Amino acid sequence: MADSLAGIDQVTSLHKNNELQLLCFRLGKNKDLYAVNVFKIREVVKYHGNLTIISHENNSLVEGLIIIRELTIPLIDMKKWFYYDSQNKNKDLRPYRIEKEKGEDDIVMICEFSRWTIGVRIYEADRILSKKWTEMEQSAGLGGSAGNNKLVSRTRYFDGRLVQVVDIEKMLIDVFPWIEDEKHNDLETLSKIHSNQCVLLADDSPSVLKTMQMILDKLGVKHIDFINGKTLLEHLFNPTTDVSNIGLIITDLEMPEASGFEVIKQVKNNPLTSKIPIVVNSSMSGSSNEDMARSLKADDFISKSNPKDIQRVVKQFLELA
């Protein structure tokens, strides 16, 4: 219980100051720096246990299954994923796996997000980097073709070197495409929602935005989409925007320039917009993030891009009686 409360206090402190913490790591010796939000990482371990091979295909992104603290989880080699191309799924990825010196243990990030727990092999963990969200820059369009982006944002290391933040939700979709297939199946069960009001949607992941657009289109609701919280806020508070036409805001939590927490804070603290419902759509579904979002007066918190959850909240806040 004490650990749980400490976690909530830590998240609260960071987001009240519009800050985030990133675990920096490399995929090769003396290579580029990459990062993932620390709240998506349970721990980093040295692993020298058994690896249960589940696929012998040359293009497999899953190395096999490992056991960490009595939990069996899939192991993914992040470097191999960086060379994966969704337009060429049969590409041989074996030459791109992370290579360690003989006798060296694997370094594995145990990641928890979107209700999944996975192991991600990296070359080495570096250190934790604390940043303001305003110090994060958008990376949409980098790290591959428009449909193959693997990076969502970038910032600078202590010495000025570039640090690139990985789109770990995109990795999950690429590794387990049936997750998206299930969402597409759920799409077919959705029914139209009758409303004249508009939804404002913010997410920095192109893959998530695409999925959310499909869901909202299927529901038949008007929506305006933004690549981060800053652009959403600029639109919302533009003098030409008719706030009375906005019936709902759906926002991610971690976004460059202005986070979802900043969106909630600014919208709820302004008398002109305080009545607009805000739903958090996040893969960081831990209790500390949910508690923090609700403490800032978010109206609901749902798991990332779940069609049935989206239908529920849109129906709740938008549908005309």
Curated annotation (Swiss-Prot):
Q: Does the keyword Transferase apply?
A: no
Q: Which Pfam families match?
A: CheW, Response_reg
- Where in this protein does the record say 4-aspartylphosphate is found? D252
Residue span(s) of domain Response regulatory: 198-319
Q: Which residues form the CheW-like domain?
A: 19-177
* A biological process from GO: phosphorelay signal transduction system
Q: What happens when the gene is disrupted?
A: Deletion shows a severe inhibitory effect on chemotaxis, although swarming is not completely abolished. Mutant also shows defects in mouse colonization.
Which keywords, in A-to-Z order, does the entry hold? Phosphoprotein
Query: Which InterPro entries does the record cross-reference, listed alphabetically?
Result: Chemotax_regulator_CheV, CheW-like_dom_sf, CheW-lke_dom, CheY-like_superfamily, Sig_transdc_resp-reg_receiver
Q: List the disulfide bonds.
A: none
Reported function? Plays an essential role in chemotaxis signal transduction system in order to colonize the host stomach. May act as a phosphate sink to control the flow of phosphate to CheAY.
Q: What is this protein called?
A: Chemotaxis protein CheV1
Organism encoding this protein? Helicobacter pylori (strain ATCC 700392 / 26695)
